[in-house]
Amino acid sequence: MDDSRETLGPNAFVTGFPIKHSRSPLIHGYWLKTLGLPGSYRAHEVAPDAFPDFIASLKDGSSDFIGGNVTIPHKELAFRLADKPDDLAHELGASNTLWLEDGLLHATNTDGRGFTANLDERHPGWDRHDTAVVFGAGGASRAIIQAVRDRGFREIHVVNRTVERARELADRFGPKVRAHPVGALAEVMHGAGLFVNTTSLGMDGEAAPLIDFAPLAADAVVTDIVYIPLNTPILRQAEEQGLSVVDGLGMLLHQAVPGFEKWFGERPVVDAALRALIVADMEVH
């Protein structure tokens, strides 16, 4: 995109600390170019102690941004500082998408929508069963549990090494969510139609524990929110055991859609060319 189009605005951001690793500028830049829209989307690193001032500059109009994405470690504070967080952000206690509207700073969390949209695209019918297993109870698991519950699953078994963390999630998300220690994994997998890894196991090619997926339903789907590498050890194990798998890259791509539409006025499409662009970037960085 040439500079003249960028200076016409609107301008959006992704902020975190650090932020240089973010692929969001590549995603949104692709959409701006393919849709022929004016504006820019750029990485803007903000240290934790400077984040309240950054939000204040959005609210008072002294920055040139109309909104943007928020990533680690600012998601919880972004939620607290927003004027109008929506119901999704309220339940999660975190937001990843901000926009100015009617003089107020609005906030939502699109991670769950990215998760379900990825599965809808890559494996339609993934939600035909009513039982899911979520492996891990860290911050990343919240949006997954929320999205799976809201899609209509009746039982969501959260399995974690520290069962107290899983119990906190069960308390937060209601009676459909049940907490279990790792030792109960095989038991709670019985007949489940969805298995989601929300841990960092296998990230950057690290080893992951061996998991016997045999207790899952024969047509179950195994997915991983880790997308580096695309084919994580957990996905490889599941595929070798004859199950359908969905990698986590699409979650990153689809979670970006609602924000882009808010800032730039058109709903973008996650297509094969965008996925190929990000995969190529992953191979060199």
Curated annotation (Swiss-Prot):
The keyword Lipid biosynthesis does not apply. Shikimate binds at S22, R23, S24, T71, N96, D111, Y227. InterPro entries: Aminoacid_DH-like_N_sf (IPR046346), NAD(P)-bd_dom_sf (IPR036291), SDH_C (IPR041121), Shikimate_DH (IPR011342), Shikimate_DH-bd_N (IPR013708), Shikimate_DH_fam (IPR022893), Shikm_DH/Glu-tRNA_Rdtase (IPR006151). The keyword Amino-acid biosynthesis applies. Belongs to the shikimate dehydrogenase family. Pathway: Metabolic intermediate biosynthesis; chorismate biosynthesis; chorismate from D-erythrose 4-phosphate and phosphoenolpyruvate: step 4/7. One of its GO terms (biological process) is amino acid biosynthetic process. The gene is aroE. It catalyses: shikimate + NADP(+) = 3-dehydroshikimate + NADPH + H(+). It is an enzyme of class 1 (oxidoreductase). NADP(+) binds at D87, G136, A137, G138, G139, A140, N160, R161, T162, V163, E164, R165, I225, G248. It comes from the Bacteria. GO terms for molecular function: NADP binding; shikimate 3-dehydrogenase (NADP+) activity. Coiled coil: none annotated. Keywords: Amino-acid biosynthesis, Aromatic amino acid biosynthesis, NADP, Oxidoreductase. Involved in the biosynthesis of the chorismate, which leads to the biosynthesis of aromatic amino acids. Catalyzes the reversible NADPH linked reduction of 3-dehydroshikimate (DHSA) to yield shikimate (SA). This is Shikimate dehydrogenase (NADP(+)). Its EC number is 1.1.1.25.
